[in-house]
Amino acid sequence: MPRKFLVVVDDSPEFEAALRFASRRAKSTGGRVVMLRVLPSDSDAHWSGAREEIARQQRQEAEVLLNRLGEEAMARSGAAPVFLIEQGDAQGAIRKVVAADPDIKILVLAAGTGSRGPGPLVSAIIKHGAQIGGRKLPVTIVPGELTEEEIEDLA
């Protein structure tokens, strides 16, 4: 099986740098991109019908987003990406996905720029180490402000 590069699809401005880098690395190494979208846990809706409708809408929006971004990943990597949707917190979802798929070999995150700091996922990985899903997993942290040309050169 080809090695897989895991990218967490979030709404941060630097996310696209991580996706571009992972896609180019996958192409240059014969690998594949895994795109993980994490949905928030059950909402505070008081009725189960409302909760179910909110969850259905969130999942539908995630599928549309993954399909749109997946086209870009496929164009850059040359292989169809794997789409995953999990519910809960991002760190827990990453651990679950990595534990379930031994072909995931690298986690690719993009660091935020400016006064915001590197971002919550990058900060958590730095603080707790790369022991993810019961195994050590290399983490590539891509500067969020890299240009397309710089990513091409590095990947």
Across the structure, where does each feature detected by a protein language model lie?
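Small/aliphatic-rich secondary-structure junction motif
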Residues: 3-49, 134-135, 154
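Short, hinge-like loop/turn segments at secondary-structure boundaries
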Residues: 50-54, 99-102
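A short helix-to-beta-strand connector/capping loop
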Residues: 75-82, 137
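General small-molecule cofactor/ligand-binding pocket signal
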Residues: 34-36, 82-86, 140-142
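A short acidic, glycine-rich active-site loop
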Residues: 52-64
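Gly/Ser-rich helix-loop-strand patches that form or flank binding pockets
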Residues: 100-155
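Charged docking surfaces used in two-component/phosphorelay signaling
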Residues: 85-93
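A generic structural signal for well-ordered alpha-helical segments
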Residues: 26, 73-74, 130-132
